[in-house]
Amino acid sequence: MIMIRIWNNYKGKYRFFLSNCRSFSSIKRPQIPESEETSLSITQRRFDPDLAPIKTRVYVSLFHTLFRLYLSCERLYGAARTLSAMCTFGVVPDSRLWNSLIHQFNVNGLVHDQVSLIYSKMIACGVSPDVFALNVLIHSFCKVGRLSFAISLLRNRVISIDTVTYNTVISGLCEHGLADEAYQFLSEMVKMGILPDTVSYNTLIDGFCKVGNFVRAKALVDEISELNLITHTILLSSYYNLHAIEEAYRDMVMSGFDPDVVTFSSIINRLCKGGKVLEGGLLLREMEEMSVYPNHVTYTTLVDSLFKANIYRHALALYSQMVVRGIPVDLVVYTVLMDGLFKAGDLREAEKTFKMLLEDNQVPNVVTYTALVDGLCKAGDLSSAEFIITQMLEKSVIPNVVTYSSMINGYVKKGMLEEAVSLLRKMEDQNVVPNGFTYGTVIDGLFKAGKEEMAIELSKEMRLIGVEENNYILDALVNHLKRIGRIKEVKGLVKDMVSKGVTLDQINYTSLIDVFFKGGDEEAALAWAEEMQERGMPWDVVSYNVLISGMLKFGKVGADWAYKGMREKGIEPDIATFNIMMNSQRKQGDSEGILKLWDKMKSCGIKPSLMSCNIVVGMLCENGKMEEAIHILNQMMLMEIHPNLTTYRIFLDTSSKHKRADAIFKTHETLLSYGIKLSRQVYNTLIATLCKLGMTKKAAMVMGDMEARGFIPDTVTFNSLMHGYFVGSHVRKALSTYSVMMEAGISPNVATYNTIIRGLSDAGLIKEVDKWLSEMKSRGMRPDDFTYNALISGQAKIGNMKGSMTIYCEMIADGLVPKTSTYNVLISEFANVGKMLQARELLKEMGKRGVSPNTSTYCTMISGLCKLCTHPDVEWNKKAMYLAEAKGLLKEMVEEKGYIPCNQTIYWISAAFSKPGMKVDAERFLKECYKKKNARSSNS
């Protein structure tokens, strides 16, 4: 109590601020406002002449006691303030106190920014750092991948370095897959007169094993005069992956070592990190057969890995086994269990686990609280997460960068960008320096929200305070370029980031594979996949899903191959895997394949998602199997999967094929009985379905019912009605509907004007089109690709090729890329009048702009060329050229793209190729076409 009173008496006298002392590096830190809770700052030392030597000794003793008390309670910022207070009273803390604090900050995960800040204050206080402090600082930089800083500190000759210094740098390089670079430090150590020890060699052996270079690892083993248990454990765990465990085990036993629980736990840990969780489980059984019994570390490693691999049942079963066997459950186990339950989506059980650990007299630390905050944020319960952070501060458990980053991630996911940026500033106020992940999350959120300028400013600020660009930032920038369609810039961006020292990780590679597959660059996507494989990056279910999605899209593999390949790699497919494969089968029209995958998914114990159900229902409806589709609906109800708007649309589209209003209304009522609730979206879907068939009277009745039930029609409702009137050629009614909409105070959108422009163009009222286009622009709306497509089609219908091309040029100048259908209209215009040169140029334009031709494009081009070949006025040499071009396009269409020519195109092919010497080629091509056509019709 005396100590606390003395502390409180002098508490008001302390001024804490960030000193302007020269740091050990050239990084300039921003002036951060002081915080009473977390400030680490030091005032200029002042000596009080009135303090007697005896009194000084009392204060020194009290400060030392207070410092140790704070450290024992893990209240590190309190310990830091104590050292600051000592300096204020002219009592310089010795290096042991500084070293203890630096060490604790490092082991508690409060990475390099806080460690380096304490290190700077130590120097400012006039205490020279020793090799221990330097080693901790280097380790903190290695942990976050700032290897260049770590190496520069190693080579700073101001402080004498030792074996531990080199081993720390070697370990950091090996952890980041840079074993070759780490090996070079062995010779440097010898030159410095520092001999490598067993730790040096074991670290390098482990590093080479991790990157798959077992030859170099074995060579290092031969260099060691005496192998220890750790060396054998490293080799054993690495050779397990190569199925050569017998050889490594034999070497270990011959050296006089028996594998113990640590050895097996290390192997299990290595397997789990490599994604081979099931093999880790098998090894758990094997170790028990050898009378080596797992401890809580073994169980915790496996439980954590099973949760991360989404194998929740096995994880919980293993935890139960651990409890039954009487293995004590500590804070780490509780934290892993709680985190895993959050990942499994079991929010209630996760919260119960937290209550259990409190009832078990466990004291939550920053890691436990962070797992709780992260889980709550991912579950969308931000208010509870905010409450937990407040509770942490009340209990003097200071949130770290991971805690705040989790909270910021939660805000960003909810679109609460102002709160995210505000918390980022609060972190700086509390001397918790944001890391690359924190900045990356906010930058990515700003990009997604279209706030590009703010995102770029934040990335500049990040670099200014010394946070290097890293994997998270790279991922945010890559995703931004993907969203805005600037795929070509991605390679340059990656090259630039790698040159700055960013090492691509599994997530980066997965993103790059996804970006290039979606951008249509199959070759680049596969090149990134190959590089990922060569670098020894582990494949998980997410990265494999991206790969098979792209390969299925480009027709490189089948669903069976994808499933088999995944199992061979030891990766268990998840619901997303099955959805990808089923969706691919649906596009190919393989209904049997979809049903096989549906059954296989359920046999694997994977519960279908709503997306899975919609794929199966959609396939059955497309094939006219309504009864079977209803059967799937019944299964959905049993699995407590409720149909959504997509399900509703699938059934309504199918019923509309009969072109009978009673069938559509019957389906509507059926879906309502299965849990679809009436809403504006449901009414709009029903009205749109009726209007597509021109059933505007029925649609108007539905709209009346909609209003009677309290659902106010919106722009979508009126757009559908206008479209229906245009389909039925009721142009005046369509335009009067627009007037009604405006009178009701409902604002038109781009789709409204597109509907009117398309309807008027189809009716041949081109002069009216110009008037509506002007009104659209006067309301500040820019024409989009649909607008231009309608305008070009309208000009084409009246035979105005010049007008069509003028609008096409305007479209390009406006920065829009025409769709395939737009190009088809233009190509058809030129082909119909025999201007194949212009048609050919447009086809080339499609290629340059990344627009893929479809069946209609090829048929138009081939038919046009074949027509010219049969024309009597065309010269023979030009006929030969047209014929060769038609043949090339036909080959590309059938053999490369897998498209089948329509009957009219086949007629013109027959006419053109029926000349002497051409019949054999014609017959071969036509046989192939008919074979493919028959195969496709039989599948459907």
Swiss-Prot record:
tRNA-binding keyword on record: no
Domain of life: Eukaryota
InterPro entries membership: Pentatricopeptide_rpt, TPR-like_helical_dom_sf
Protein localization: Mitochondrion
Short name of any one Pfam family annotated for the protein: PPR_1
Transit peptide start and end: 1-24
Ranges for the PPR repeats: 59-93, 94-129, 130-161, 162-196, 197-231, 241-259, 260-294, 295-329, 330-364, 365-399, 400-434, 435-469, 470-504, 505-539, 540-573, 574-608, 609-643, 644-678, 679-713, 714-748, 749-783, 784-818, 819-853, 854-891
This protein's UniProt keywords: Mitochondrion, Repeat, Transit peptide
GO cellular component: mitochondrion
Family: Belongs to the PPR family. P subfamily.
Name used for this protein in its record: Pentatricopeptide repeat-containing protein At5g14770, mitochondrial
